[in-house]
From Swiss-Prot:
GO cellular component: cytosol
UniProt gene name: argH
Protein name according to UniProt: Argininosuccinate lyase
Keywords: Amino-acid biosynthesis, Arginine biosynthesis, Cytoplasm, Lyase
Taxonomic placement: Bacteria, Bacillati, Bacillota, Bacilli, Bacillales
HAMAP family reported for this sequence: Arg_succ_lyase
Primary enzyme class: lyase
Compartments, record wording: Cytoplasm
Primary localization: cytoplasm
């Protein structure tokens, strides 16, 4: 077939060269955005008198027809037409005649594709924010059910201090809240229009870029035509934000994997989110959590890939930028899928409160409570720390725990120890006393839950 840009060429490319250069196999995902962008563009052309109202109406009817066909997956794309833009333009001309060729007046594929991706990410970022809020709602429900579920808090994967399981869950709520905030802020950069920037230098036609942007639901235009067609920082920002979100999901999945093991037995995954072994009948593997953890590297790779593509590109457009899309599409699909799986996995998991409770009665995670006890009685904390360290050593040598040490032995270490010491050794009491802002104390958790519920309700309302 003859190319829409083929006027200055005398030889046709080999089929394998065409296939190598074509992007229609993946950029067809932009079909809705491409057609909607074209409808806005031709509407503007008519308003400015660049095409007649009759021509614009004919073009819009043709585009609306193609849009409906696209929604029903009835469009047939060709490699010969290279990309989504030329495929749609070719179909339009076939449908309505040569007047369809006027659609591209005052526009280049360079600003067209950038516009498509802005519209695509606008939609997808809003979807991801909503899905993240749904996951946060699941976290809130689990936290509400586990305010008084006591578990070990860890540093260096060693038991450190007793905490509420709700407090642990809510830590991820706030990480996700920052992820949502980052996505929301990125919409300021996504919701601007490159349309009308042309190939790189603008156009000689009297277009109205602000009007086109308004028709597309965007909040403004790029101020520089070179910048509009040549940068992909809005995609990089999306990939960066998605990498951080996936990192948070991956960290939580790592813990879920550990907690579901026989060594911990803190939780049990629903059968819906686990798999078995082809050889070992007893196995119940946390495959979905492992897959989310694994797919995190995939999203990181998409970020690093585009950063590497961009780092050496002179202004303005270069064909290298064709490589900006597949990683973006893949990241959207990956993040949406992981959020959906994560929400279901957390909603259906069983919490083994008894095992968590046992874990904080057979360790030394209450050692800090004794140091605080002495400090509250006026002893410098460093001296209190030294005394408690010796008490822990004494216990490990005897094979006992701090609660088993008789008061007489405590008094040998410090005369400040009294009978009330044993009250602070209870994990429940230890958690309850940590009532500083943002702490694991039950009162603080109730406050955090109220705030968290308010944030999720507000998001659902919007």
């Amino acid at each position: 077939m003859s190319k829409l840009w083929g006027g200055r060429f005398t030889e046709e490319a080999e089929a394998w060269v065409e296939e190598f250069g074509a992007s229609i196999s993946f950029d067809q995902q932009l079909v809705n955005q491409d057609i909607n962008g074209s409808i806005a563009h031709v509407t503007m052309l008519a308003k400015q008198g660049i095409v007649t109202k009759e021509e614009a109406e004919k073009i819009k009817i043709g585009l609306q027809y193609l849009l409906e066909e696209a929604k029903q997956n009835k469009l047939h794309f060709s490699v010969e037409a290279e990309d989504i833009h030329l495929n749609i333009e070719k179909m339009l001309i076939e449908k309505i005649g040569e007047v369809g060729g006027k659609l591209h007046t005052g526009r280049s594929r360079n600003d067209q594709v950038a516009t498509d991706m802005h519209l695509y990410l606008k939609e997808k970022v809003e979807h991801i924010m909503k899905a993240t809020k749904q996951l946060q709602t699941v976290l809130v429900h689990q936290a509400e059910n586990n305010i008084e579920t006591i578990m070990p808090g860890y540093t260096h994967l060693q038991r450190a201090q007793p905490i509420s399981f709700a407090h642990h869950i809510l830590a991820y709520f706030w990480m996700l809240e920052r992820d949502v905030n980052r996505y929301e802020d990125s919409l300021k950069r996504i919701n601007i229009s490159p349309l009308g920037a042309g190939a790189l230098a603008g156009t000689t036609f009297p277009i109205d870029r602000e009007y086109s942007a308004e028709l597309l639901g965007l909040n403004g235009i790029y101020e520089n035509s070179l910048d509009a067609v040549s940068d992909r920082d809005f995609i990089l920002e999306f990939l960066s934000n998605s990498s951080m979100l996936m990192m948070h999901l991956s960290r939580f999945c790592e813990e879920l994997i550990l907690w579901s093991s026989q060594e911990f037995q803190f939780i049990e995954m629903s059968d819906q989110y686990a798999t078995g072994s082809s050889i070992m009948p007893q196995k119940k593997n946390p495959d979905m959590a492992e897959l989310i953890r694994g797919k995190t590297g995939r999203v990181y790779g998409n970020l690093f890939s585009l950063l590497t593509v961009m780092k050496g590109l002179p202004l303005a457009y270069n064909k290298d930028l064709q490589e900006d899309k597949e990683g973006m599409f893949d990241t959207v699909k990956t993040v949406e899928g992981c959020l959906h799986i994560m929400a279901g996995m957390l909603e259906t998991m069983t919490v083994n409160k008894e095992k968590m409770g046992q874990a904080v009665t057979q360790d030394f995670s209450n050692a800090t409570e004794i140091a605080d006890y002495l400090a509250n009685k006026g002893l410098p904390f460093r001296q209190a720390h030294e005394i408690v360290g010796k008490l822990v050593l004494h216990c490990t040598q005897k094979g006992i725990y701090l609660v088993d040490v008789p008061l007489a032995t405590y008094k040998e270490m410090s005369s400040l120890f009294e009978e009330d010491l044993y009250e602070v050794l209870s994990p429940y009491a230890a958690v309850k006393r940590r009532n500083s802002a943002g702490g694991t104390g039950f009162e603080q958790i109730e406050k955090a839950l109220e705030k968290a519920k308010g944030l999720t309700k507000e998001a659902i309302k919007n």
